Every structure is written in structure tokens, then in C-alpha cells.
């Protein structure tokens, strides 16, 4: 298959994204918004948004697609999936459901970062949330994405398929 690399024109987003404290934050928001726009314009079925600071284990994509097919068909509903089992999701004693995927179990979560797989249908349905995520630096950054999970199912694997290599010491991953 052909792979298209889409250049990022920051000027396209100058009047859309609120002025930020630094260029890096603006660039991150612009890049994310362009990714969401490409998914909305060109996505057909499943859409996978992947940040550049993750290490993915070899079975990740196969396991996610097979588990998506199994779980979404069992519950007759489109879902969101994260490839990482984030440490920060264990900070609160929140109830979760365990689902059987292809070769591992998955648990329901109510927060994610910006690396996730979903459907074009859910991207369209919650476009305002995706768009709002990119207009300013929110606290948490994924505030509007996390609002979606009040109505939709988001899951992460029990035994992570990816490792988030963040540049800070935090519960979001390893530094």
C-alpha cells in the first residue's frame, strides 16, 4: 500500500488554536488537530491515532484488531481501545469491567491519552470533543476525550501492548 506523509502547515491553525505559552504546545495541538482531521476526512472503518513516544510490542496491531472485532461484536457497539495499560489508571479505586479479547484480557477505563483506536463513526459522532481537545491546552490535556468515555466504552489491555516513553517522571509512563 501507498503511505502518504502529510506535512504540517502550522499557519493553517494560527487563527483556530488559542495562543499558547510556548511554540511546542501550539505545535503539538496543531499536529493533533491535523491528525484528527485526516482521520475524519479519510478514515473509513477503524482509525488509529498514534503518538510518537510509544514503543509498541510486536503483537500490538494484530491483538488490537482481533480483540476489537471480538469485543465490539459481543457488545454490539463501537468502542475505543488504548494499546497501553497506563499506571495512572490504577491511582484511584475505580470499578472496571474485564472483557475477554483475542489473546488477552482488557479492562474498561474512563481516561486515555491521545494514542487510541476507534471507528470513523465514533470520530464523526464526537467530532466536537476531538476538535475542542485541540483548541487549547486543557487540564488534563485529554479533558474532552475523557468526556466521551462517560457514554462510550474505552478499554486497555491487561498486559500492555505498548509502552509510553514520556519525558517526565509521572504515572503516564516511563521516563
What are the functions of these language-model segments?
Residues 1-44:
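Active-site-proximal specificity loops/subdomain of glycosyltransferases
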Residues 2-7, 80, 154-156:
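Conserved beta-strand scaffold positions in the cores of enzyme catalytic domains, especially
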Residues 10-14, 25, 53-55, 86-89, ...:
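Short, solvent-exposed loop/turn segments at secondary-structure junctions
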Residues 17-23, 95-101, 170-174:
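Short, surface-exposed amphipathic charged segments that create phosphate/polyanion-binding patches used
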Residues 25-33, 110-114, 120, 135-146:
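Conserved glycosyltransferase catalytic-site signature
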Residues 46, 55-129:
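Conserved catalytic core of nucleotide-sugar-dependent glycosyltransferases
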Residues 120-121, 125-175:
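C-terminal catalytic/acceptor-binding lobe
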Amino acid at each position: 500500500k501507498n503511505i502518504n506523509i502529510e506535512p504540517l502547515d502550522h499557519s493553517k491553525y494560527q487563527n483556530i488554536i488559542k495562543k499558547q505559552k510556548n511554540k511546542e504546545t501550539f505545535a503539538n495541538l496543531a499536529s493533533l488537530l491535523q491528525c484528527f482531521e485526516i482521520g475524519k476526512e479519510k478514515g473509513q472503518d477503524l482509525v488509529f491515532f498514534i503518538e510518537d513516544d510509544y514503543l509498541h510490542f510486536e503483537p500490538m496491531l494484530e491483538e488490537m484488531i482481533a480483540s476489537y472485532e471480538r469485543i465490539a461484536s459481543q457488545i454490539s457497539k463501537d468502542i475505543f481501545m488504548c494499546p497501553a495499560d497506563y499506571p495512572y489508571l490504577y491511582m484511584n479505586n475505580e470499578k472496571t469491567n474485564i472483557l475477554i479479547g483475542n489473546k488477552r484480557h482488557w479492562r474498561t477505563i474512563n481516561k486515555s491519552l491521545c494514542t487510541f483506536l476507534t471507528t470513523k463513526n465514533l470520530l464523526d459522532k464526537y467530532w466536537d470533543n476531538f476538535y475542542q481537545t485541540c483548541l487549547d491546552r486543557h487540564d488534563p490535556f485529554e479533558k474532552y476525550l475523557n468526556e466521551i468515555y462517560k457514554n462510550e466504552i474505552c478499554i486497555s489491555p491487561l498486559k500492555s501492548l505498548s509502552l509510553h516513553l514520556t519525558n517526565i517522571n509521572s504515572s503516564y509512563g516511563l521516563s
